[in-house]
């Protein structure tokens, strides 16, 4: 259950996220630099003031690494791609925190039909993505492909919660994980020289992903 303070921080997050998306759409560097570093700390405060704190340290870790990754990618946008790997590593650490939370919460583990279906879908999409990235012959091919596995982990982790709490929580977590994967797919396609989007779409899907993951975790727990 969310406290009134947690709800306020959730609403504040959505306002700041909207500001960042508008800043990206208008290509306003000042708005982007002001709003993006605020996103993960606000979500962290939302957890801090919520009444559900099951393994909260893992969520603090996920959002802290998300904050670090956001900062690295901000620097990357100004200095070229030398910060890209550091940003990607930070987000991978955050994904591991999310997956560990899902894994520890979902004990005893159950192999349900949604998990099996999700596994086969992840395998099919990952195989296609790897072929696409390898075809580009980009020098970051292997790190990008490995990162894709981290996205698979949080998708499957969200499905592990099936039957361990309210269905709404699982669906929110799953939607957040899928949006995270889509956001990172857009970034990856840009990195290999095949952009499909603009920065506003990346931030729209990313900010929603983080918000839905946290909301889903709070609901399911």
Residue ranges and their predicted role:
Residues 1-221:
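Polytopic alpha-helical membrane-helix bundles and their juxtamembrane interface segments
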């Amino acid at each position: 259950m969310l406290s009134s303070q947690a709800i306020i921080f959730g609403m504040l997050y959505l306002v700041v996220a909207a500001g960042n998306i508008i800043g990206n759409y208008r290509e306003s560097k000042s708005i982007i630099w002001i709003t993006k570093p605020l996103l993960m700390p606000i979500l962290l405060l939302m957890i801090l003031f919520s009444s559900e704190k099951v393994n909260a340290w893992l969520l603090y870790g996920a959002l802290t690494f998300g904050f670090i990754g956001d900062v690295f990618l901000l620097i990357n946008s100004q200095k070229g791609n030398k910060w890209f790997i550091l940003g990607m590593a930070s987000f991978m650490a955050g994904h591991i925190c999310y997956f560990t939370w899902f894994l520890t919460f979902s004990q005893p583990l159950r192999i349900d039909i949604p998990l099996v279906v999700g596994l086969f879908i992840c395998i099919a999409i990952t195989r296609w993505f790897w072929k696409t990235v390898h075809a580009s012959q980009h020098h970051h091919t292997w790190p990008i492909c490995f990162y894709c596995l981290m996205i698979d982990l949080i998708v499957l982790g969200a499905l592990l919660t099936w039957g361990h709490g309210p269905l709404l929580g699982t669906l929110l977590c799953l939607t957040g994980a899928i949006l995270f994967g889509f956001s990172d797919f857009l970034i990856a396609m840009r990195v290999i020289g095949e952009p499909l989007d603009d920065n506003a779409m990346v931030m729209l899907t990313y900010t929603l992903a983080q918000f839905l993951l946290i909301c889903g975790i709070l609901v399911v727990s």
